[in-house]
Amino acid sequence: MCKIIAIANQKGGVGKTTTTSNLGIGLAKHGKKVLLIDADAQGSLTDSLGFTEPDKLEETLATALGNIINDEDMEADYGILKHKEGIDLMPGNIELSGLEVSLVNVMSRELVMRSYIELVKDNYDYILIDCMPSLGMITINAFACADSILIPVQAAYLPAKGLQQLIKTIGKVKRQINPKLEIEGILLTMVDNRTNYARDISNLLIENLSLIHISE
């Protein structure tokens, strides 16, 4: 059975893309079939994996979701790129920004990505979705089709207050759209345990995050 994990935090620069690629490659090295989905209009995951001009790609997540919206036939391997580390990639690019705007007028707009996932999930053990640094419609789509959400948090600032909006959104999606949705965990990133500051921040984060829970 395929497990779908969204890697998300509405704050940029916390290590979402690095977490997605490293986790995916690690799973592949353990013999798992892995698909990475770049659901960020910046195309950072696509670029970081060596596909350095994502905006020139003709088949991407945006065009795949467009096919779903328009009820067009599509093969499960549509747009998927192969990587030397043994992972597959559905690339993302700037076209996702336009798609996010157009989703406003689409029926069942929160479930478009779920339809795409249904098409491809039988080919994989894990699907990892690198989300935009926002809580827009593309990110909501990722939450609507995910089994769980992994939240990278940089251990150099106090994010508990900022995380509350993310946790609130996850809870709303769980209640209204995707009752199976859970938080996979909070991943502290960019931690330098050699400094007292980093250790203090990490401990404070753990204390604060223990008070946050997803609403049923």
State where each predicted segment sits:
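P-loop NTP-binding core
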Residues: 1-216
